[in-house]
């Protein structure tokens, strides 16, 4: 099954300290897909997609495990650094899923509204306190028109890559 191969590839992604600080929700229910299509800028292709994966930054599982093993001792709540690692883990896994899909001719689209409509999606997926949906990956076989579509132009590397330290945009770079 190609979807399982995609999920397996996602799970093999590099992860901070091998902690796997993310979860993947495989959305199969058509009613949920329909709600996602509406909550994410009314994009009907979401509801029609054969594969919809939600990548969740997930520190809840570790927090629960720490509480279990610590018994009566107080457990440290996750902080900003923990969530940044969880975000990174989730996004790296999502990108691995994209590459795996592309290797099988399956296209993908990242949907950022999963973050923008956080409260709605938290409730829709029954997400606990120390979790955040960070990426929705909608996957399927591209229509012929999509195959011919030109890829959007990306920034030139001189606007993205700095050497040894961060470079601010100066007037010259902005005007270029």
Regions from the language model: what does each represent?
Residues 1-176:
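Acidic, surface-exposed loops and disordered segments
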């Amino acid at each position: 099954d190609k979807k399982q191969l995609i999920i397996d590839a996602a799970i093999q992604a590099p992860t901070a300290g091998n902690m796997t600080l993310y979860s993947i929700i495989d959305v199969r229910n058509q009613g949920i897909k329909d709600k996602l299509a509406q909550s994410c800028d009314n994009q009907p292709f979401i509801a029609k997609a054969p594969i919809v994966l939600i990548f969740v930054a997930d520190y809840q599982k570790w927090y629960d495990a720490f509480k279990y093993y610590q018994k009566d001792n107080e457990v440290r709540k996750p902080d900003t650094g923990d969530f940044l690692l969880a975000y990174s883990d989730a996004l790296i896994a999502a990108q691995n899923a994209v590459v795996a899909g592309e290797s099988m001719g399956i296209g993908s689209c990242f949907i950022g509204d999963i973050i923008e409509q956080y409260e709605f999606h938290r409730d829709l997926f029954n997400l606990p306190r120390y979790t955040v949906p960070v990426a929705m990956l909608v996957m399927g076989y591209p229509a012929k028109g999509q195959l011919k579509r030109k890829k959007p132009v990306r920034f030139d590397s001189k606007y993205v890559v700095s050497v040894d330290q961060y470079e601010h945009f100066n007037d010259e770079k902005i005007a270029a």
